[in-house]
Design a protein with these regions (language model features):
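Core SAM-dependent methyltransferase catalytic element
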Residues: 196-197, 214-236
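Conserved alpha-helix/loop element of class I SAM-dependent methyltransferases that forms part
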Residues: 27-45
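N-terminal, positively charged/glycine-rich alpha-helical extensions of SAM-dependent methyltransferases
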Residues: 1-19
Length: 236
């Protein structure tokens, strides 16, 4: 399963299930808690880039001056309402943001994106994460913030994911609509910080009773997945 194959499956799945996904993140308690954390992090930001937006705003758009919503699939996402007045859509891949102005944004946010950047192997998937973070750092102004909201797992579960990744990804690809994912421990995401960026904040977002797993509401206590906010500051 190549990165290109994963991108296509992500497009098909999230385009088809956009309305249901919006409803779930709007009503499930885990994402209500997540929204409060995001709102606090973006409040007062002048220029915000939301990379991997997918047509879903998991925060109050009024808290930022202007928002550039970036996604590879924006042209294929049906829109049931007009965008907020301060939002500009841009079609681009997080793995290649060459068409996006460099050193332009005060903050860049990625919400539940990194675990979807899977490749043929677990190693290729982590390379995609590194590339995505580097691309996002390039469009940040000096002293800008890279805000990552991500589903993480304990190290023991990550080792399990690595051991079964290729057969599990093949089975998922053949059997369900949702694309395969690879979740990382918090320490691994901190480890792959882009050059010139320093960790400013790591905040655990308390799980509620329900959390999405492969697009399906799932009891929070039955999964090791843990939402977290990680903020990098561009220092160079």
């Amino acid at each position: 399963m190549t990165t290109q194959t994963t991108e296509k499956k992500n497009q098909d799945y999230f385009s088809k299930n956009l309305v249901e996904y919006r409803a779930n993140v709007g009503r499930l308690d885990t994402y209500q808690r997540q929204r409060a954390v995001i709102d606090a992090l973006i409040a007062g930001t002048d220029k915000l880039a939301d990379v991997g937006n997918g047509g879903v705003f998991e925060y109050s758009t009024a808290l930022a001056g202007s928002i550039t919503a970036i996604d590879l699939f924006l042209d294929g996402i049906p829109r049931d309402a007009s965008l907020p007045a301060n939002v500009t859509p841009v079609q681009a891949s997080v793995l290649d943001l060459q068409g996006v102005p460099g050193e332009h944004f005060d903050a860049v946010i990625m919400i539940m994106l990194l675990h979807h950047l899977t490749g043929k192997t677990a190693s290729a998937s982590l390379d995609n994460v590194r590339k995505a973070l580097l691309q996002c750092a390039k469009i940040l102004k000096p002293n800008g913030r890279l805000i990552i909201i991500e589903s993480t797992v304990p190290r023991w579960f990550y080792w399990f994911e690595l051991a079964v990744y290729r057969p599990a990804a093949w089975i998922i690809d053949k059997c369900i609509d949702h694309p395969a994912t690879l979740q990382y421990p918090i320490a691994k995401l901190v480890e792959v910080a882009p050059p010139g960026c320093a960790v400013e904040l790591v905040e655990i977002i308390p799980k509620g009773r329900w959390i999405l797993q492969f697009g399906v509401p799932f009891p929070g206590w039955l999964t090791p997945a843990q939402p977290v906010a990680i903020v990098f500051r561009k220092t160079a």
